Design a protein with these regions (language model features):
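Intrinsic disorder
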Residues: 104-105, 135-139, 144, 148-151
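Alpha-solenoid ARM/HEAT helical repeat scaffolds used for protein-protein interactions
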Residues: 6-8, 27, 49-52, 71, ...
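Short coil/turn connectors between adjacent alpha-helices in alpha-solenoid helical repeat scaffolds
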Residues: 23-35, 68-80, 113-125
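Hydrophobic packing position at a conserved site in alpha-helical tandem repeat units
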Residues: 1-6, 36-50, 80-94, 127-135, ...
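Pentatricopeptide repeat
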Residues: 13-18, 22, 57-62, 66, ...
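Positions within ordered alpha-helical repeat solenoids
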Residues: 3, 22, 26, 42-45, ...
Length: 154
């Protein structure tokens, strides 16, 4: 590709990195999560070095969250929630491109539902109410029995 354009300084952008993370998320490989997280970290390192166009965005994070949620790791839901917290912290610090959206929250809530700890799914659902509009999908993921408990708390 560099030869075709006579440019030897081609470098992948956020879209390229997101595609690689997405491939890992769909791979079902045992080490997919560690690879996806390493790519996310590398993107921040490259961005901090001053190279434009590689800063992770909400799509990047949601894809890493998806990779976590699809993993067979026992702590996947906890790790997904921790990554969601990182997104919220970065957003609150001024990075508007990483504001968690419906997809981000649904992935984390679904990860808790799969972990059989449905009560824990109420925590990200509550955070979601303060960050974005909720949808019926969140309540479906945490179960109808949890919906009444959630509604009575908030």
């Amino acid at each position: 590709m560099a030869t075709a354009t006579n440019n030897s300084t081609l470098f992948p952008d956020v879209i390229s990195f997101n595609a690689v993370i997405n491939a890992w998320a769909k791979s079902n490989e045992a080490f997919a999560v560690s690879r996806a997280e390493a790519i996310l970290q590398r993107m921040y390192e490259i961005d901090k070095s001053g190279f434009p166009g590689v800063k992770p965005n909400v799509h990047t994070y949601s894809t890493v969250l998806d990779c976590l949620a699809k993993s067979r790791s026992k702590d996947a839901a906890i790790r997904a929630e921790a990554l969601l917290e990182v997104m919220l912290e970065r957003y609150n610090a001024g990075d508007i491109h990483v504001m968690p959206n419906t997809i981000s929250f649904n992935i984390v809530i679904n990860a808790f539902a799969k972990s059989r700890d449905r009560d824990a799914a109420v925590i990200p659902a509550a955070k979601f109410c303060y960050t974005a509009k909720h949808s019926i999908l969140q309540f479906t993921n945490i179960g109808l029995d949890q919906q009444s408990r959630f509604a009575s708390r908030y």
